[in-house]
A protein has these predicted regions:
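A short, Trp-centered hydrophobic/proline-enriched beta-strand micro-motif
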Residues: 118-128
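Flexible, small-/acidic-enriched active-site or ligand-binding loops
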Residues: 193-222, 226
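Glycine-rich phosphate/pyrophosphate-binding beta-alpha loops
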Residues: 78-81, 132, 157-163, 206, ...
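N-terminal glycine-rich flavin-associated loop
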Residues: 84-104, 133
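Alpha-helical interface subdomain recognition
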Residues: 1-79, 83, 100-104, 116, ...
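A short core secondary-structure module
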Residues: 149, 153-197
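Short Ser/Thr-interspersed hydrophobic loop/turn segments at strand-loop and sheet-helix junctions
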Residues: 50, 73-77, 188-193, 217-220
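Long, acidic (Asp/Glu-rich), low-complexity accessory segments flanking structured domains
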Residues: 218-249
Length: 357
């Protein structure tokens, strides 16, 4: 059964990440949000201290409760959502490689996503297309086998680290008639001919994170860079063609496991807004007393804190289930992400109202 008391190790790591966010992220958050430049300096500092590394990711996801990834994500995003995503964005392709790859692919490509402490690099996970966002079955990017290699052509949009990553994990349709069950994931290394960056997006938020199109123009991918290998893919396609019931697409499987952590990112945003509004309310004097002593303000802050705590429990429950029960029974990961996103919107809106008081 899940204990609500964090271990000493979990607390130590959480506090270490919080200190990094307070010391290295918050002071430059405004600068990178204004410039919309990728925060390489912060990523390099994270790599130097071991926060952006294969070893830390292994330690984080080896946590027996499953909670540590959320603790880390919440603290980083408390510092700045955009810079946090610059540091954590590589986890999505890593999750795909770890979940789908062979032992050899895992050993080769996960370290390649991070680089070294002296020379950190990035990974990207490319699924979304102009007409295939939530509707992954409408994906137009194709992978065709020719002379032993795979040839990929198509265009992806809204890709975190797209075009600047050293490793891109790209999902493409191998057999379009099978919908999501006819898709596969491919690892594409830096410098591969035919993969280029398209338009970089200008965003209303998380602007320190690089978001761009990637264009695949007959990109040749060796067969050993098909995640899971040829035999596994052929077996999956055969089951689908025979009408055998199967699970969702490779892309959706990856998203399913990472949704609670995205929820934790929203919690970091909400918590930062709540703390800022609470501290302001203690200092702002109106009618001879701090506005936090006004019941309307106090009630609003109490509701904000309650919503944050309740949403965190959904995240923790989903992560515990993922660690101990395998698959979610009732879309618990999506529930956690949904609730946390709604809480982030509500809390930040209420914080703005308090700052106007």
């Amino acid at each position: 059964m899940l204990s609500f008391e964090l271990s000493d190790e979990q607390k130590e790591i959480r506090d270490w990440v919080h200190d990094f966010a307070e010391r290295e992220i918050r002071p430059v958050a405004h600068q990178y949000d204004e410039s919309e430049e990728f925060p390489w300096d912060v990523v390099k500092k994270a790599a130097k201290v071991g926060l952006y590394s294969v070893d830390f990711i292994q330690q984080t996801y080896a946590d027996e409760t499953g909670l540590l990834p959320a603790l880390v994500a919440e603290e980083l995003t408390w510092g700045c959502a955009g810079i946090a995503l610059a540091i954590t964005g590589t986890q999505l392709p890593v999750a795909a490689i770890f979940g789908q790859g062979t032992p050899e692919q895992i050993a080769t490509w996960i370290p390649a996503c991070y680089g070294t402490a002296d020379n950190p690099v990035l990974g990207a996970f490319a699924v979304t297309e102009a007409n295939a966002g939530s509707d992954v079955s409408s994906m137009k990017t194709r992978a065709v086998k020719k002379n032993g290699d795979w040839h990929l052509s198509g265009q992806k949009v809204f890709i975190t680290n797209g075009g600047i990553a050293d490793v891109h994990v790209v999902v493409a349709a191998v057999d379009p008639e099978l919908g999501t069950r006819g898709q596969a994931s491919f690892v594409i290394g830096k410098g591969t001919k035919g993969l280029t960056q398209g338009k970089k997006e200008k965003k209303m938020g998380i602007r320190a994170s690089h978001t761009a199109e990637i264009i695949l123009d007959d990109v040749v991918v060796p067969s050993d860079q098909l995640l899971g290998g040829e035999e596994k893919l052929e077996a999956k396609l055969a089951r689908a063609r025979s009408g055998e019931h199967g699970r969702s697409s490779v892309a959706l499987k990856t998203f399913e496991t990472t949704r609670p952590v995205v929820g934790a990112q929203a919690l970091g945003i909400a918590r930062a807004a709540f703390e800022f509004a609470r501290d302001y309310a203690k200092e702002r004097i109106a009618f001879g007393k701090p506005i936090i002593e006004n019941q309307a303000i106090a009630f609003k802050l109490a509701d904000m804190a309650t919503e944050i705590e309740a949403a965190r429990m959904l995240v923790w429950r989903a992560l515990w289930m993922g660690r101990h029960g395998g698959e979610f029974k009732m879309a618990e990961g999506s529930m956690a992400k949904l609730k946390c996103g709604e809480v982030a919107v509500k809390v930040t809106e209420d914080a703005i109202q308090i700052l106007g008081g």
